[in-house]
C-alpha cells in the first residue's frame, strides 16, 4: 500500500473532519487512511504477529541506529529531536490516567512517558515510532519492529484522525497510548482483510522529532497556479458527473489558498484575486452539493461567499435558492430566486426555478 494517502472522505465526498455528523455517538461512515507499511502488507495477515519479549530485545538492538538518526537530525536548526540518549522503544504500561481528546470520549490518550519542549506547530513534518493493535491486543503494524520511523506532514490528511489529533498534543520524546473507536480510525468498513469492520484500535506512539515546514510556494503567482490546477481537475470530474471527486479537488484548491503562511502580506490586487478565486471555488462546491442533494452543505458554502464579501451575482442567488429548496426552506429559497431575477430579469431558467420552488412548497404544505 502506498503511503501517499488520499484525503479522508465522508459519504458526501466532502473532506472529512472529526466533528459529529449525526447518528450514534462515536460512530462514523468515514473510511479513513491508515498507517500501514508495505512490509506488513506484503506478508499474509492471517496469523498477525504479536508483541513478545523477543520483539523488545530486537528493539533494544536497534537503539544505536535510532540514536544516530536523532544526532543527524540535530544538524537541522529547525528540527526538534528527542534526546539521543533515550532509546526509541515504546514502553507498554501507561503511567497516567487517560486524557479525553474529543467531546464524546471516543479518543483517549494515556501518557506513558513525558516529553519536553513545545508541541508541533500546525503543518509540521513529524517523525514518530508507533505500534498499532486491534482491541484484542493483536499487533497489526509496527514501525518499531521494522526499525523504520514514520514521517509525515501534519494537516495533510495522510493518516487517520486518531494519529493526527494525538500527535498535535504531544511533545518531543513523549510516549503515549491512544485508544480510539472506529470514528477516528478505520471507519465502519475497516480495511479488509487487515482491519475488521467497525473496530476500536490502540496505538502506542512516540514523537521522535518535528521540523517546521518550508514554504511550498515562492510567490503568490505560483500559489494561484497550484490552486487552479486542482480546480481544473475538479472541473473535469464535474463534467463527468463525478461530483464527489470534484468536491475533493475543490476542497484541496481552497485549502491551498487558505494557508495564512502563504497569503500573509499580500497587496490589494493580490487579495482581490485571492477572494475572487475563493468565491468561484465555493460556488463550484455548492453546485456539487446541489447535484448530490445535499442542501445543508450547499447553504454553508454559499454563506462562505457572503462572508468573503464578494459581489453576489444572479448565479449565486440561483445556487443558494436551490440549496434552500433542497433543505425545504422554501421562503428563503423564493427570496433568493426573486433577487436573482432582479439581477437577470430575462433569464427564463430563473423564473422556471422560482415556479418549481412554489410548487414544491405547496405540495409540502398539503
UniProtKB/Swiss-Prot annotation:
Keywords: Isomerase, Repeat, Rotamase, TPR repeat
Superkingdom assignment: Eukaryota
EC number annotated for this UniProt entry: 5.2.1.8
Region of interest (Disordered), residue spans: 1-26, 47-97
Molecular function terms, GO-annotated: peptidyl-prolyl cis-trans isomerase activity
Annotated S-S bridges: none
TPR repeat segments: 227-260, 279-312, 314-347
Activity regulation, free text: Inhibited by both FK506 and rapamycin.
Span of the signal peptide: none
Catalytic activity: [protein]-peptidylproline (omega=180) = [protein]-peptidylproline (omega=0)
PPIase FKBP-type domain ranges (all copies): 123-211
Pfam families noted in UniProt: FKBP_C, TPR_1
Biased composition (Low complexity): 11-26, 47-92
Similarity comment text for this entry: Belongs to the FKBP-type PPIase family.
Functional note: PPIases accelerate the folding of proteins by catalyzing the cis-trans isomerization of proline imidic peptide bonds in oligopeptides.
PANTHER family: INACTIVE PEPTIDYL-PROLYL CIS-TRANS ISOMERASE FKBP6
Protein name per the record: FK506-binding protein 6
Source taxonomy: Eukaryota, Amoebozoa, Evosea, Eumycetozoa, Dictyostelia
